[in-house]
Amino acid sequence: MVNVDAVRKDFPILEQVVNGRPLVYLDSAATSQKPRQVIDALVRYYETSNANIHRGIHTLATRATDQYEAVRGKTASFLGVSNPEDVVFTRNTTEAINLVARAWGDANLGAGDEIVLTLMEHHSNIVPWQQLVGRTGAVLRYAGITPGGTLDLDQVRGLIGP
């Protein structure tokens, strides 16, 4: 079981009190809060390696590119992706969803194809698919939630077709 208090301690911003209660941040699709380890790594990077990647041969550019590609390799390994070049970094979830809807969706979905979302989606995971439906003629379906507030898995199974 995850120790929520221990995890919260890794996030300096969550030490704040708002309206008399500990801060809770639930809008991470566009901007996620950073744990201390990430903040420290960013500071080290800005102090030692800050440069454009894949754009130069000088020391800092080479160092930054090497670090960037090393992270791509580690990410591929962690995700079980055989080719690190298949890993694409985006600035946030919102940008990633838009990229998938535009690049993959436009190339692979057409009239009558079905897209299944849930009624629990963040706004950033609804609009790109609505726009895709408008461009392609695909059909958008929504899976509901149970009275207990969880995803209705039976409804999901019924919405996913051949």
Residue positions per predicted region:
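Pyridoxal 5′-phosphate
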Residues: 1-162
